[in-house]
UniProtKB/Swiss-Prot annotation:
InterPro entries the UniProt entry points to: ATP_syn_F0_a_bact/chloroplast (IPR045082), ATP_synth_F0_asu (IPR000568), ATP_synth_F0_asu_AS (IPR023011), F0_ATP_A_sf (IPR035908)
UniProt-listed PROSITE patterns: ATPASE_A (PS00449)
Biological role stated in the UniProt entry: Key component of the proton channel; it plays a direct role in the translocation of protons across the membrane.
Lineage of the species this protein comes from: Eukaryota, Viridiplantae, Streptophyta, Embryophyta, Tracheophyta
Major place of residence: plastid
Membrane topology reported for the UniProt record: Multi-pass membrane protein
Organism: Vitis vinifera (Grape)
Gene name in the database record: atpI
CDD domains (UniProt xref): ATP-synt_Fo_a_6
Record protein name field: ATP synthase subunit a, chloroplastic
Subunit structure: F-type ATPases have 2 components, CF(1) - the catalytic core - and CF(0) - the membrane proton channel. CF(1) has five subunits: alpha(3), beta(3), gamma(1), delta(1), epsilon(1). CF(0) has four main subunits: a, b, b' and c.
């Protein structure tokens, strides 16, 4: 009963975290729901960039790839390698999920450094990278959790839950809490790094607007890419772990 209570409290904590606000926000009222407009707007822009780029790159595929097609094939091979390394031989069906996570986070992170979100005026708050908002990172982390539970149950059925008493039943509470704390670590790592990067750039621009921010922005682009890779790699590792049933 105590374990169940702890798990429920952890899930409730994740729900409460999704309501955390940093600064002012702009909302839309749709029916009886309050929608976070800033995150939706910037997420739609990121999705449009991804869909537009992919469409332009593969609208006229060539036997010998050139330019955009060559770049996207390289990205696909990179994602396949990451998925195969972490998941194993059954990685194929998970490449679209891992690739979607990686590309969305990567473009979202870079949009925070390259796109002039601040020049777009809103009634309240301001636009920023989607991953600069805790609501986005928690949603991505919860999707990852659903994915690795689905992977484990699909592969092993109800026998998947046997891992919680391995190597000894004494570890049952710890093993259960481990699965519910994975989304916390994923979401806070991504949110904290992207928010900190944007805050550092804003502070330096206000202090030394012409010189110092440039190398810091390049460093931000590098760390943004690394954060996308870390998230995708951990997501693939969690899925592979749930299918293999070991820690």
């Amino acid at each position: 009963m105590n374990v169940l209570s702890c798990s429920i409290n952890t899930l409730k904590g994740l729900y409460d975290i999704s309501g955390v606000e940093v600064g002012q926000h702009f909302y839309w009222q749709i029916g009886g729901f309050q929608v976070h407009a800033q995150v939706l707007i910037t997420s739609w822009v990121v999705i449009a960039i991804l869909l537009g780029s992919a469409t332009l790159a593969v609208r006229n595929p060539q036997t010998i790839p050139t330019d955009g097609q060559n770049f996207f094939e390289y990205v696909l091979e990179f994602i396949r390698d990451v998925s195969k390394t972490q998941i194993g031989e059954e990685y194929g069906s998970w490449v679209p999920f891992i690739g979607t996570m990686f590309l969305f986070i990567f473009v979202s992170n870079w949009s925070g450094a390259l796109l002039p979100w601040k020049i777009i005026q809103l009634p309240h708050g301001e636009l920023a990278a989607p991953t600069n908002d805790i609501n986005t990172t928690v949603a991505l982390a919860l999707l990852t959790s659903v994915a690795y539970f689905y992977a484990g149950l699909t592969k092993k059925g109800l026998g998947y839950f046997g891992k919680y008493i391995q190597p000894t039943p004494i570890l049952l509470p710890i093993n259960i809490l481990e699965d519910f704390t994975k989304p916390l670590s994923l979401s806070f790592r991504l949110f904290g790094n992207i928010l900190a990067d944007e805050l550092v750039v804003v502070v330096l621009v206000s202090l030394v607007p012409s010189i110092v921010p440039i190398p810091v922005m390049f460093l931000g682009l590098f760390t943004s890419g690394i954060q996308a890779l870390i998230f995708a790699t951990l997501a693939a590792a969690y899925i592979g772990e749930s299918m293999e049933g070991h820690h």
